[in-house]
């Protein structure tokens, strides 16, 4: 539908006649709106909605389709009335762009995040009307609906037509040419940073209010205390920062751990959101909570009975049920539960003469079963991005597996009544709506993911996975690529990624017919309960290392086609840390690949941005708990290093600074260990650029082939 410019994050308007998207075609990242003809399936017109100097992203339609909420990284000292704030930000952007001095001054931590310096900016939420004039820069020109840019004095358009009718506007941002209004002023990220998934902000159904997540603690670098805040969309004439802040309400202040991803119920009574309970611990269990907007009470919907992390979730249109995804043993099933009954203290009198027998049974059932999870029978794979459509009769979701990227599927849901035995009548087989990758996948041979279990550390059952090479011959012996996941609170599973893709690692290379890929979900992995996750806290090289070695032992003993004399180990992030730990604690591998791994735990604490992570995992700071840091630091085993190692690191990795990679490579070279370093000056914690990804795969596979493949 959009082929003449880049387009990202498409979002349909409530009426289905338009959609918004983000594009870098003009003025950097901006919000665009396209008119859509449903009959022909084509875009009939499109225009740029925003013209904000600090750029725009993350658009979200209001329920009535009249406004769009979006994010922009702005200078908090510019907080003022909408017009003045916009002009102030534009001036600062111009000054920074044109200045020959690039020095920065930091007065607090978290001055950089993931792969970028914050440059004194904070993320704020803005709202802008969709209809009429599409400006949001007073004094910088205004866009007509056709996208022409008026000069600051409105005397002529960019097309040069002197006397063209200028859009009206005023200092306060009222009228048909209203500038975008900042709904989250202050020196905070509001909303907080998100790596994807559900937004950390939402509109109320009546469009009068928004809810968003923000951390207002004095030092966010050591805090996970994201709270949920609500604020009216309009707070008064002028919408000054003082007015907005006075009308803003913190609804989760009692919880000192993280709250995020708010989502209003369609009837407007509740806000559902995810929450953790332990402050400072980013890998605590994500629970699904409900905030009652009338009583201001908060409820744990499943009362702690689900020992899994709640992923994405969505409301049924009648607000009676919530659908959610949960990671479980390498898969992500879809589940649902009822909202009502004794969860909110509601009691239904079954003897009420006005109730029919079916109504009495329905009420009784909800009282008893509100917390029971029911499964939507979608076998295997990872299911996510849940949406209910068709007046509650269809469930849309994305599904992927290790051998196929995401596609959109739909499942029929017929719910005429609520019955104890089968409250929802769920269609048995989803219908695949998109097949965007079929033509490519038909040309590629891939193997299914095989699961195995073995006794790991502490006698606990641990799950592993295996992928055979294409055109597998059981009579042959195959070398091994032993992949170690990051996190450490992450997991391997039946999902797809172009980064660290097990199918690509299993594929034939110039040196042979392919590799057996083995992956272990060691203690600390997600999808096996919170106790299993917590086991790695303060024990980075302990049970996890034991699980990995025992898992590989098990595979060697039970899969005779594995050549145990030709094994390699590869890991990134925590997997890179474990690769570094392995170099100093075993010589069983012919070669190692360490990508963005922690090498010196003490210096890594000072280099990282999210200090809460290191201080939780190593139980404090290096100067307060030096013994713990040194116990698990790979660099202290450097005299044992012998295994040929490829080091990979990106200059823009601020989670694990590039100095960790340089330190490792220097140590390997000084120890006389065969080693090589692949350095990306333009990548962060992940290698994301397609051409860089090709270089990454070739370099990694060539390294393994050199030491293992032949």
Model-identified regions with their sequence ranges:
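Active-site-proximal cap/loop segments of hydrolase catalytic domains
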Residues: 483, 508, 519-710
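Cap/lid segment of the alpha/beta-hydrolase catalytic domain
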Residues: 424-430, 434-565, 572, 604-606, ...
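Residue-level detector of Asp-centered blade-edge/turn motifs that repeat once per structural unit
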Residues: 14-15, 63-64, 205-206, 266-267, ...
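Intrinsic, low-complexity polybasic segments
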Residues: 136-165, 174, 235-239, 341-353, ...
């Amino acid at each position: 539908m959009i082929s003449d410019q880049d387009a990202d994050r498409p979002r349909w308007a409530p009426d289905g006649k338009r959609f918004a998207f983000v594009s870098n075609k003009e003025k950097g990242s901006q919000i665009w709106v396209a008119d859509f003809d449903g009959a022909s399936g084509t875009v009939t017109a499109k225009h740029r909605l925003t013209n904000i100097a600090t750029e725009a992203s993350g658009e979200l339609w209001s329920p009535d389709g009249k406004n769009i909420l979006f994010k922009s990284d702005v200078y908090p000292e510019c907080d003022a009335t909408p017009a003045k704030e916009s002009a102030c930000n534009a001036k600062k952007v111009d000054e920074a762009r044109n200045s020959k001095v690039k020095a920065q001054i930091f007065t607090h931590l978290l001055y950089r995040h993931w792969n970028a310096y914050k440059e004194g900016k904070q993320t704020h939420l803005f709202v802008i009307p969709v209809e009429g004039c599409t400006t949001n820069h007073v004094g910088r020109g205004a866009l007509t609906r056709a996208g022409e840019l008026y000069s600051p004095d409105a005397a002529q358009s960019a097309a040069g037509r002197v006397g063209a009718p200028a859009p009206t506007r005023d200092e306060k941002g009222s009228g048909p040419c209203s500038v975008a209004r900042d709904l989250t002023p202050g020196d905070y990220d509001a909303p907080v940073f998100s790596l994807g998934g559900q937004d950390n902000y939402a509109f109320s159904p009546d469009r009068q209010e928004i809810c968003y997540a923000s951390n207002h603690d004095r030092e966010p670098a050591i805090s996970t205390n994201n709270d949920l805040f609500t604020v009216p969309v309009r707070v008064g004439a002028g919408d000054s920062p003082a007015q907005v802040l006075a009308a803003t309400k913190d609804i989760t202040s009692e919880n000192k751990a993280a709250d995020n991803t708010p989502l209003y119920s369609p009837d407007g009574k509740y806000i559902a959101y995810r929450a953790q309970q332990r402050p400072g611990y980013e890998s605590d269990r994500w629970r699904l909570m409900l905030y009652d907007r009338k009583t201001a009470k908060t409820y744990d919907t499943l009362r702690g009975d689900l020992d899994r992390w709640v992923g994405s979730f969505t409301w049924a249109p009648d607000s009676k049920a919530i659908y959610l995804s949960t990671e479980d043993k390498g898969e992500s099933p879809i589940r649902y539960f009822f909202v009502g009954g004794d969860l909110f203290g509601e009691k239904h009198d079954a003897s009420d003469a006005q109730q029919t027998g079916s109504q009495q049974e329905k009420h009784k059932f909800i009282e008893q079963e509100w917390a029971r999870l029911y499964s939507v029978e979608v076998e295997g794979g990872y299911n996510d991005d849940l949406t209910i459509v068709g007046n509650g009769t269809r469930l849309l979701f994305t599904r992927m597996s290790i051998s196929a990227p995401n596609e959109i599927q739909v499942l029929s849901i017929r719910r005429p009544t609520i019955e104890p035995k089968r409250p929802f009548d769920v269609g048995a087989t989803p219908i695949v709506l998109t097949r965007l990758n079929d033509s490519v996948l038909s040309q590629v041979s891939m193997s299914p993911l095989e699961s195995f279990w073995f006794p790991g550390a502490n006698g606990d059952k641990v799950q592993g996975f295996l992928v055979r090479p294409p055109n597998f011959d059981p009579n042959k012996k195959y070398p091994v690529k032993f992949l170690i996941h990051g996190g450490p609170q992450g997991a391997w599973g039946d999902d797809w990624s172009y980064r660290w893709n097990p199918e690509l690692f299993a594929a034939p290379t110039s040196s042979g017919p392919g590799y057996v890929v083995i992956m272990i979900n060691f203690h600390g992995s997600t999808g096996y309960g919170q106790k299993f996750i917590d086991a790695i806290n303060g024990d980075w090289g302990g049970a996890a290392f034991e699980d990995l070695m025992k898992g590989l032992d098990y595979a060697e003993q039970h899969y005779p086609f594995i050549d145990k004399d030709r094994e390699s180990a590869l890991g990134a992030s925590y997997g890179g840390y474990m690769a570094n730990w392995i170099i100093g604690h075993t010589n069983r591998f012919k070669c190692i690949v360490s990508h963005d791994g922690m090498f010196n735990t003490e210096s890594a604490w000072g280099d990282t941005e999210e200090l809460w992570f290191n201080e939780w995992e190593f139980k404090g700071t290096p100067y307060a708990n030096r013994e713990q840091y040194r116990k698990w630091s790979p660099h202290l085993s450097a005299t044992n290093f012998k295994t040929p190692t490829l080091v990979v690191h990106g200059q823009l990795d601020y989670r694990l600074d590039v100095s960790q990679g340089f330190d490792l490579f220097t140590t390997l070279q000084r120890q006389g260990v065969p080693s090589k370093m692949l350095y990306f000056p333009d990548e962060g914690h992940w290698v994301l650029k397609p051409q860089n990804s090709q270089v990454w795969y070739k370099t990694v596979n060539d390294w393994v082939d050199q030491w293992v493949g032949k």
